[in-house]
A protein has these predicted regions:
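Bacterial N-terminal signal peptides that target proteins for export
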Residues: 1-5
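Primarily extracytoplasmic/secreted proteins
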Residues: 6-202
Length: 202
């Protein structure tokens, strides 16, 4: 390599696929069918629950953050959990307890798959007892810059609009090359529970 040449280094993960598991069956189970990927890919996923207790962390996965709320009074508890896994590359089914015995076509779970990620940074759950069309994600102190930040909403409330610089994929949002995240508002597909999770990856 001459003194005039430079080595190009990818500093942040690259989004390679997105998957949305969009149903919960009569037993209250929601599952995401994750296709085969490359070994070492990072999968960030969430599972929602119609109780005050977030779904247990599935075997082989690690928990990042949880969020809970009770937006409509007694019996209206909602919760969500964000998890991650550095995969061996094989196809798999990720299953969460949906906390309800009623079948639904609402998206109870979903995931984003990244290639080139090395670590999980800080994560936070967003809890609110209010309802509305806006999910407010608070400030996240980024430990290593630049980073990719991922936001998930709650079941039935896909993200339809995000701050400038964010990309929306199947109702989930992410932003690359961030040096700071001072918080912001995300528009939801319905006026419902304002709940979600956010995480930094690099």
């Amino acid at each position: 390599m001459s003194k005039h040449q430079a080595l190009l280094v990818t500093l942040v993960p690259i989004l390679v696929a997105s998957v949305l598991g969009s149903t919960v069956n009569g037993a209250g189970v929601t599952s995401i069918s994750i296709p085969a990927t490359a070994a070492g890919d990072l999968i960030i996923a969430f599972g929602s629950n119609r109780t005050s207790t977030p779904s247990p962390t599935p075997a082989g996965w690690a928990s990042i953050a949880t969020g809970t709320c009770n937006p409509f009074g007694t019996g209206s508890d909602r919760s969500t959990r964000m998890v991650y896994q550095f995969t061996d590359g094989g196809a798999q089914t990720l299953t969460f307890d949906g906390g309800s015995g009623d079948a639904s076509a609402d998206p109870y779970s979903g995931c984003l798959i990244f290639r080139g990620a090395s670590e999980i940074g800080v994560g936070a759950g967003v809890s609110s007892n209010s309802t509305g069309p806006t999910l407010t994600i608070p400030t996240l102190t980024i430990n290593r810059v630049p980073a990719t930040v991922v936001v998930f909403s709650f079941y039935g409330d896909s993200i339809t609009a995000a701050p400038a610089g964010w990309t929306i994929s199947n109702g989930m949002a992410y932003a690359e090359y961030l040096n700071i995240w001072a918080g912001g508002n995300f528009t939801l597909s319905a006026t419902a529970a304002e709940i979600g999770t956010v995480v930094e990856i690099y």
